[in-house]
Swiss-Prot record:
GO terms for biological process: translation. Keywords: Ribonucleoprotein, Ribosomal protein, RNA-binding, rRNA-binding. Belongs to the universal ribosomal protein uL14 family. Part of the 50S ribosomal subunit. Forms a cluster with proteins L3 and L19. In the 70S ribosome, L14 and L19 interact and together make contacts with the 16S rRNA in bridges B5 and B8. CDD domains: Ribosomal_uL14. Binds to 23S rRNA. Forms part of two intersubunit bridges in the 70S ribosome. The gene is rplN. This is Large ribosomal subunit protein uL14. One of its GO terms (cellular component) is cytosolic large ribosomal subunit.
Length: 122
């Protein structure tokens, strides 16, 4: 469950290390986002000479959360940290590599490019 002011790790090589959620997209009263949701983030920490700079505002897709993700078969999956992948306006990843596992739920949301770049899909 990601809400405004939540800090997330960045799971790609766009150059950002930490981002902060500044808006959950998908309705005016929507408060929280989960895996596969698109949020608006501000870059809080970035590598030097990278594609993105500190203070930049981008969209991001949540790929890992500490909060449980429930599957229809009753299984539960959770991670040690909250992580996101920065995407462009047309929801294409900014980076060319994805670090760490991502969840299968991204496939149903249409993020096939992220699924194909990820080293592991859980």
């Amino acid at each position: 469950m990601i809400q405004m002011q939540s800090n997330l790790d960045v799971a790609d090589n766009s150059g950002a290390k930490r981002v902060q959620c500044i808006k959950v997209l998908g309705g005016s009263k929507r408060r929280t986002a989960s895996v596969g949701d698109v949020i608006v983030v501000s870059v809080k920490e970035a590598q030097p000479r990278a594609k993105v700079k500190k203070g930049d505002v981008h969209r991001a897709v949540i790929v890992r959360t500490k909060k449980d993700v429930r599957r229809p078969d009753g299984s539960v999956i959770r991670f040690d940290s909250n992580a996101a992948v920065l995407v462009s306006k047309n929801e294409e990843p900014i980076g060319t590599r994805i670090f760490g596992p991502v969840v299968r739920e991204l496939r149903g949301r249409g993020f096939m490019k992220i699924i194909s770049l990820a080293p592991e899909v859980l």
